[in-house]
Curated annotation (Swiss-Prot):
ATP binds at residues 15, 164-166, 230-231, 239, 245-246, 262, 266. It holds the Pfam family S-AdoMet_synt_C. The gene is metK. GO terms for biological process: one-carbon metabolic process; S-adenosylmethionine biosynthetic process. This is S-adenosylmethionine synthase. Catalyzes the formation of S-adenosylmethionine (AdoMet) from methionine and ATP. The overall synthetic reaction is composed of two sequential steps, AdoMet formation and the subsequent tripolyphosphate hydrolysis which occurs prior to release of AdoMet from the enzyme.
Length: 384
């Protein structure tokens, strides 16, 4: 592939689907705090003036779903009824049952390492050396734009901003290398009393310029800031939100394949989540070790079975060692059985709410972002 464009998008913590994700993961964290062995599949639906929390949960813990929901919405910034959604007055409904005993008998084992996968499925992990966090640049900078929007909204720099926002960045590539940014889209919810010209100037100066590297911007870069001209009605008043509806935003922005399973609200026994994290960990360590410039991992499972049904390594012709050797290294250094990867990444802790906005990958504070096996892989591969 010679010259081409590639685009990724992100959404802010105040986007309706992300509100739902954060509530689901806040419930999960509260339960794991008391009961690390809990089985949680928590789904959330948000619309004007209401939140519905449902799913299947089996636990010895007791948590206050209503309080968790209100606190999460409050932290995001929906605290006035004029936004169409208010943490203090929205209705909170709960429809939670227990996990099926048919699933439990396939997952639970006396020997923990033989714990079966909570479902069948396929998961992907990806890494590339085009950014310092070993993530694709388009999704990385799309996330950083909406993170910056939240920052200047919350610290009072731009007090007329509201929680809902979206970003989209189109990068120019030449022979696989970034040569510039072709287009930037940023749409942000705002108060009624800000005019379009003032908004566009402030967004450019306070959000876009501090985030996007100047060497990638030029006179032909196109900027679309609130291109409809008005974005007052937003959040759950503008659109309903559902857990698990932003799976490409959550992962690699379309640069890598996706197995289809969402993450938020699921405890680590659900391989949709935990194995996707493990696949990222494997791919990132392979790239960090210098064994490839780009790496995509696929892993698959059968419900109730511990060993993965398949492991694939794709390096797009950038590998520095034979592909067959990479597979052997993965099997030697990474335990991808469900309980093995939970142990490997220390996943039975309340760390999930933070993942639910601005991407699950590329932020160094998560355990699956460690590159602690890179040197081991490099030595085992015989690279100097």
């Amino acid at each position: 592939m010679a010259k081409h464009l590639f685009t990724s998008e992100s959404v802010s913590e105040g986007h309706p689907d992300k509100i739902a994700d954060q509530i689901s993961d806040a419930v999960l964290d509260a339960i794991l705090q008391q009961d690390p062995k809990a089985r949680v599949a928590c789904e959330t639906y948000v619309k004007t003036g209401m939140v519905l929390v449902g799913g299947e949960i089996t636990t010895s813990a007791w948590v206050d779903i209503e309080e968790i929901t209100r606190n999460t919405v409050r932290e995001i910034g929906y605290v006035h009824s004029d936004m169409g959604f208010d943490a203090n007055s929205c209705a909170v409904l709960s429809a939670i049952g227990k996990q099926s005993p048919d699933i439990n008998q396939g997952v639970d084992r006396s020997d923990l390492l033989e714990q079966g996968a909570g479902d069948q499925g396929l998961m992907f992990g990806y890494a590339t050396n085009e950014t310092d966090v070993l993530m694709p640049a388009p999704i990385t900078y799309a996330h950083r734009l909406v993170q910056r929007q939240a920052e200047v909204r919350k610290n009072g720099t731009l007090p007329w901003l509201r929680p809902d926002a979206k970003s989209q960045v189109t990068f120019q590539y030449d022979d696989g290398k970034i040569v510039g940014i072709d287009a930037v889209v940023l749409s942000t919810q705002h108060a009624e009393d800000i005019d379009q010209k003032s908004l566009q100037e402030a967004v450019m100066e306070e959000i876009i310029k501090p985030i996007l590297p100047s060497e990638w911007l030029n006179t032909s870069t196109k900027f679309f800031i609130n291109p409809t001209g008005r974005f007052v009605i937003g959040g759950p008043m503008g659109d309903c939100g559902l857990t698990g509806r932003k799976i490409i935003v959550d992962t690699y922005g379309g640069m890598a394949r996706h197995g289809g399973g969402a993450f938020s609200g699921k405890d680590p026994s659900k391989v949709d989540r935990s194995a996707a994290y493990a696949a990222r960990y494997v791919a990132k360590n392979i790239v960090a070790a210098g064994l490839a410039d780009r790496c995509e991992i696929q892993v698959s499972y059968a419900i109730g079975v511990a060993e993965p049904t398949s492991i694939m390594v794709e390096t797009f012709g950038t590998e520095k060692v034979p592909a067959e050797q990479l597979i052997l290294l993965v099997r030697e250094f990474f335990d991808l059985r469900p309980y093995g990867l939970i142990q490997m990444l220390d996943l039975l802790h309340p760390i999930y709410k933070e993942t639910a906005a601005y991407g699950h990958f590329g932020r160094e504070n998560f355990p699956w972002e460690k590159t602690d096996k890179a040197q081991l892989l490099r030595d085992a591969a015989g690279l100097k």
